[in-house]
Each structure stands twice: as C-alpha cells, then as structure tokens.
Amino acid sequence: MFTLKKSLLLLFFLGTISLSLCEEERNAEEERRDYPEERDVEVEKRFLSLALAALPKLFCLIFKKC
C-alpha cells in the first residue's frame, strides 16, 4: 500500500511539473505573437546602430581620407 501511494504521488508530481512547463512555453509563444512590432523596433535599432558604426569606414573608403 505504501509503495502504491509513493508511486501515485510521484506520478502526480511529475505530471504537475510537465503541465507547468507546457503552460510556460505556451505563454512565451503567445507573448512572442502578441508583440511583433516591438520585435521589429528592436531589429531596426540594431540595424541603425550597425549602420552608424560603419559610416566613418564608408566615408574613408569613398573619399580616401582616413
């Protein structure tokens, strides 16, 4: 009887953990789908910072004045 209770408790515990992990993953996916414009803004910021960093090198190559 004791081993049966132990087994059932273990199954309940593992099931609870797996359900909570699935719920967290689902919430993360929903969050990613809810805010695509924020992600686009982050990509634009990264692109602009890279473009501004490359600008002096570009002028150096074009005008040959470093």
Swiss-Prot record:
Keyword terms: Amphibian defense peptide, Antibiotic, Antimicrobial, Cleavage on pair of basic residues, Cytolysis, Disulfide bond, Hemolysis, Secreted, Signal
Keyword check for Plastid: no
GO cellular component, one term: extracellular region
Predominant location: secreted
Propeptide: 23-44
Cleavable signal peptide: 1-22
Pfam families: Antimicrobial_1, FSAP_sig_propep
Tissue specificity remark: Expressed by the skin glands.
Cystine pairs: C60-C66
InterPro entries, per the entry: Antimicrobial_frog_1, Frog_antimicrobial_propeptide
Subcellular location(s) of the protein: Secreted
GO biological process annotation, one example: defense response to Gram-negative bacterium
Family: Belongs to the frog skin active peptide (FSAP) family. Brevinin subfamily.
Function: Antimicrobial peptide. Has low activity against the Gram-positive bacterium S.aureus and the Gram-negative bacterium E.coli (MIC<15 uM). Has a strong hemolytic activity.
Listed name of the protein: Brevinin-1DYb
The organism of origin for this protein: Rana dybowskii
